[in-house]
Amino acid sequence: SNTGPFGDAFAPPYDDPYVVTSGSTTGSSESLADVQPPNDQAAEKAVLGAMLLSKDLPPLMHQIVRAEDFYTPAHGRIYDAIIKLSSNEEPADAVTVADQLEKDGELERIGGRPYLHTLIESVPSPASGPYYAQIVAEKALLRRLIDAGMRITSYGYAATEGMEVEEMVNRCLLYTSDAADEG
């Protein structure tokens, strides 16, 4: 049963499978500090690889996923370079993206030219790129919700006598609304 951080007095009246307390939702003994935020590295690599293989995909992917949706910062940088080239109607393949990243001073930070070829090799099918992009976007939304939850929790703990509870509630609602709207 879920007793919550303050014992049984504040526990929900039911077991919520989505509440993570001392472990993960799978019942392992990991603490929340040990749990990696939601992400899917295979999907991130497949999105980028698909974009490198198909000149038609970058505009479509840009409607589904943004650079900040990638958990791995290097993947966001690569995505930005692909979108930059594509929006200028230039080819966005491993060679041109590497050149763009080099101009931007980012090539070594993303793992160099060989990493771009690794991305291409990781794509099961470029046609599935939009599906992988949706996975990346959903994982990013989950991370934003976690961030909103952490902010809400900190408001609850930081409440002072002078702070209006209604104002705190409105801020908390704004955080969750913003997290959902960005998704």
Which stretches of residues belong to each language-model region?
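Noncatalytic partner-interaction/assembly domains of nucleic-acid and motor enzyme complexes
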Residues: 1-141
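N-terminal non-cleavable signal-anchor helices
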Residues: 20-21, 168-170
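Short amphipathic alpha-helical coiled-coil/interface segments
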Residues: 149, 169-174
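Secondary-structure edge/capping motif, primarily at the C-terminal ends of alpha-helices
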Residues: 149-160
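Conserved small/polar residues in nucleotide/adenosyl-binding loops
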Residues: 175-180
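Extended, polar beta-sheet/loop recognition surfaces of beta-rich domains
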Residues: 183
